[in-house]
Amino acid sequence: NYQQYKSTAFVSQTGTAMLGWVVPATYQYSGQGSYQQGQKLARERLVSALQRDQLEKLPASPFENSSYRANIGKEILFEFGFLNILKAWVTGSAINLFAPSVAFSPALRSMEHPSFYETKGSGIVEKLFNYIKNSSGFLYLFILAIGTIISVIFIMLVLIGVFKMILILSPIKVATILILLGYFLIVTGPIVGVKYRLPIEPLLIMFASYAILNWKKIN
């Protein structure tokens, strides 16, 4: 990358991800409007930035292009404010933690269903309501409902496991694991999808297993 484009960046998709995913998702999950409105906002700000900087088009270099888009995305996020960003990040993390793993199953995805990202709604509650309302397949919704219940039980076991570990194990060990878990949640932010939970699945399973083992010892 440095030899061809004089860039030390590893990838040239940061700007696209920022304007195409992070900004719209933050806009939506902070309760400011729908995902589609967030996408429109990002496009309009890109056009106005080009006019402001007196540019006819984006830089030819993919890395300069990405950097330009990313900077616009950062400007928009700063305008949203810390509380809106925090709300969007917490909401996105909660969705990724509680979303049923079966949602990413090829068999389930092959069933007729609406796109979660394309479903309109200002905020997660309205979006989920519209998603359920627009889903015509009973079997699809039934499987998702069962999967969600299992996910909720699993996360409850995880929380119990964390609490038990804090009481018994070294605080440094538990803190290190929680920091690692938190890192992946922060990096993912408001971008939702079951696949983004994969890096932390081993940690979640460890906490849940610890809770079950403690329950077995007591009984």
Language-model segments: residues:
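Transmembrane-helix signature of polytopic, lipid-linked glycan biosynthesis machinery
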Residues: 1-3, 164-165, 180-194
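Membrane-interface junctions at the ends of membrane-embedded or membrane-associated helices
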Residues: 163-173, 208-219
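Short helix-capping/hinge motifs at transmembrane helix termini and TM-loop junctions
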Residues: 4-5, 98-102, 167-168, 191-192, ...
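Hydrophobic/aromatic-rich transmembrane helices and adjacent perimembrane loops
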Residues: 149-150, 194-212
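Membrane-interface anchor segments at the N-terminal boundary of transmembrane helices
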Residues: 80-83, 87-180
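Membrane-proximal stem/loop segments at transmembrane-domain junctions that anchor or position
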Residues: 9-120
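Juxtamembrane membrane-interface segments at transmembrane alpha-helix termini
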Residues: 26-27, 188-194, 210-217
